[in-house]
Amino acid sequence: MLDFMDYIQLAFSDASGWNRDNSYSTLTDTAKALLDFSTPERLRVHLSSLSTPQFATTYTLGTVGLIDGSVSYLFSTIPLDKTPSRSALISLRSLVPGYRQIYPPAVPLDLGLEWTLGSSGNTGAAEQALSNAYEDTGRSERKRKATLLHATLHLPPPTTLTALFLHRPSPTTKVSVALWSSQATNISKSASPQASILTQLFHDTGKYSTEFLFSTDNTLFGFRGLWNFGPDPRDSGGRNIATGNVKREKTSCPQSVALLSAGGEAYYSPTSSVIGLSTGVRFTTLPAAYDARSSSTSPPTLGGAGGSQIPSPISTFPYTLTLTLTPLTGSLSTTYSLLASPNLALSSRFGFNVYSWESEMVAGCELWRNRKKINLHNYNPDGSVDDLAWAKRKLGLLPPLESSDPASSSSSVSPTVSPVTSESVIKLRVDQSLRVRLLWEGRIKDLLVSAGVALGPTSAHTPSISCSGGSSSKGYSWTGVGVSVLYSS
């Protein structure tokens, strides 16, 4: 489960219009979420709050064996008032990484221009002001650039400070500066504190993306790039200023059923003479491949009944294939991830080294459990439970429940009944050495809880239970168990 600060950072990326999927660093994110998830190793409690739309705090306390804690603060120039911050209202799927659906490449638009328009109720005036801002890029009243500041202080010695600075100087550019500093230990008090800075420059055009990075640790220079095959989204239209309006939606390649992306990365450190090189390919299905409704928004085809024809789905299940190669070390890795149903995802990975002939096989899955429909008459507008809410609505003390959409009036779902939401998820992964990880994440009242256990072969010095049932120096036992609790307001 993501930390609250990571959740807010993703909300910042979405609010600023940044596509985090169009990057080589996220090429294998789906397989990593299903196969490389971590389980809690002890008891940890997180208390978080989005006190204002632009300021968030988090306090963390860990116990069992070693007591530690941390304090985190975050500030964003973009108001995140539309981001659910209460743990009772946050969607569990937005906190638990799983199968990630990739969408067609899109041209990054300057969505931040709307931030300076305020919360005006006049939509026409807002669109006209937005259009004028596009026409005159030199206006002094242009928006503030999207910026995020985040700092975390780990309190127990050795004290560690981590900080992050994110800035969006343009719709296609993002700058990231990360700082890590650790206090010297008692043994080496005379030594200077350890610190390193990582600077990254991202550029995304929709068709391709590049990333330049520099780290003060060993003076490391790096480059990453990703290229999307197929139509160029920059040639599919863009902003329509002639009509006085600006398209708020991202322009994307129409009727794309699959996406093939290829990229690579290279690193070099002149200090330690270290060279790194890798390349990878990703093939994934797009929503148009299995959802016929996405085709209904495309221009009608000639020759059909009534002048239009909606094509049928091409594939039943969304899937993602990746292939990565590290030439210098001879490592080859392939992954296959499948979304068998809205509540079930499967993934597998096979790795092979051509130099040592070592191989790796990992399989994993995640299974979601949906919550039963609840009666909204017993809930206040803020989400709190109130058995007398229905009476207060009759007396006019609470606003009435919103009626259902006329377009969906044929549906059997009542407007007084909440839609089905995800309540919990179970993740399981196992490799060729029979190392198993089992993770349960769900909601208990207003708390978000993660509980996991890791099992595997134990070393000769670790007491365990042997296969015959007696005590033995070698066997199979748990290697980690823990619980993590998150509450946010």
Curated annotation (Swiss-Prot):
GO annotation, cellular component aspect: ERMES complex; SAM complex
Q: What is its main location?
A: mitochondrion
| Keywords noted in UniProt | Membrane, Mitochondrion, Mitochondrion outer membrane, Transmembrane, Transmembrane beta strand
Q: Name one GO biological process term.
A: mitochondrion-endoplasmic reticulum membrane tethering
Which compartments is it annotated to reside in? Mitochondrion outer membrane
Q: Name one Pfam family in it.
A: MDM10
Membrane topology classification: Multi-pass membrane protein
Q: Which family does it belong to?
A: Belongs to the MDM10 family.
What's its job? Answer: Component of the ERMES/MDM complex, which serves as a molecular tether to connect the endoplasmic reticulum and mitochondria. Components of this complex are involved in the control of mitochondrial shape and protein biogenesis and may function in phospholipid exchange. MDM10 is involved in the late assembly steps of the general translocase of the mitochondrial outer membrane (TOM complex). Functions in the TOM40-specific route of the assembly of outer membrane beta-barrel proteins, including the association of TOM40 with the receptor TOM22 and small TOM proteins.
Report quaternary structure and partners: Component of the ER-mitochondria encounter structure (ERMES) or MDM complex, composed of MMM1, MDM10, MDM12 and MDM34. Associates with the mitochondrial outer membrane sorting assembly machinery SAM(core) complex.
Q: What is known of its domains?
A: Lacks alpha-helical transmembrane segments, suggesting that it resides in the membrane via beta-sheet conformations similar to those predicted for other outer membrane proteins and porin.
The molecule here is called: Mitochondrial distribution and morphology protein 10
What is the species of this protein?
Arthroderma otae (strain ATCC MYA-4605 / CBS 113480) (Microsporum canis)
